[in-house]
């Protein structure tokens, strides 16, 4: 049996996605091998997570120091030069970052927080669907001025879960009377936006339909 501190750390690391007890134990013993300075550096960075907030509109993360405590919006949502008629829906923040890297998308985003598998009710409940509808209907309430979304882009992975999610969103959002499009050609079936190269993503954005 490991000492209590080590055991507790293993249990905490085991809660990370795709990390089991054995991998978690390797993490812990790696930390024990590095210098005290490196461990303290890691501890400091983790402690600074308390300064990370979620954007009140799109749920992207940002540090409170970025806004000087004046706003609850991320850098993208605060940018007045963005096209406020376009809203791109993504599963997670890493997908948003991948699209931003293309420098081909001028609009705003909303992070749904997951996907649905075969339209299971328990999956649907975990998504930010109510928050999404509220923000499309009344963006001003969440800090976005001069915003009127005309097109909603569904940017999800071309997987079974991604397709099911887009199908469900099309059905739910239809009543809002907005143009709804999907990413176009280029992304391989079963692939993930997070790992797509910039040229492929750019092509998919430009050929959306």
Stretches found by the model and what they are:
Residues 7-11, 25-29, 40, 44, ...:
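Solvent-exposed alpha-helical segments within well-ordered globular domains of core cellular machineries
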Residues 17, 36, 48, 64, ...:
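Conserved phosphate/pyrophosphate-binding and hydrolysis machinery centered on Walker-type P-loop NTPases
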Residues 12, 16, 34, 49-52, ...:
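Conserved, well-folded catalytic cores of nucleic-acid-processing
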Residues 29, 74, 87, 93-96, ...:
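Generic secondary-structure boundary/loop-capping signal
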Residues 24, 79-140, 145-156:
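Extended interfacial segments that mediate partner engagement and assembly in macromolecular machines
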Residues 105, 133-139, 149-209:
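Long C-terminal interaction/binding lobes of large macromolecular proteins
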Residues 2-11, 15, 23-96:
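Cys/His-rich Zn2+-binding cysteine-cluster or related metal-binding knuckle/ribbon modules and their
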């Amino acid at each position: 049996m490991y000492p209590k501190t080590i055991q507790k750390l293993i249990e905490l690391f085991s809660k990370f996605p795709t990390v089991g007890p054995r991998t978690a134990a390797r993490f812990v013993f790696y930390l024990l091998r590095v210098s005290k300075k490196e461990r303290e550096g890691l501890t400091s960075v983790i402690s600074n997570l308390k300064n990370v907030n979620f954007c009140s509109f799109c749920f992207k993360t940002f540090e409170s120091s970025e806004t000087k405590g004046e706003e609850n919006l991320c850098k993208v949502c605060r940018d007045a030069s963005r096209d406020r008629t376009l809203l791109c829906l993504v599963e997670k923040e890493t997908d948003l970052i991948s699209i931003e890297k293309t420098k081909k998308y001028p609009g705003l985003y909303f992070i749904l927080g997951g996907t649905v598998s075969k339209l299971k009710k328990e999956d649907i409940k975990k998504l930010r669907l109510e928050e999404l509808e509220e923000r499309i209907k009344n963006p001003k309430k969440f800090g976005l001025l001069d915003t009127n979304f005309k097109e909603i882009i569904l940017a999800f992975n071309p997987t079974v879960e991604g397709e099911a999610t887009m199908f469900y969103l099309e059905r739910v959002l239809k009543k809002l009377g907005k143009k709804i499009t999907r990413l176009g050609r280029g992304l391989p079936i079963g692939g993930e936006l997070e790992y797509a190269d910039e040229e492929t993503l750019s092509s998919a954005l430009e050929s959306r339909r």
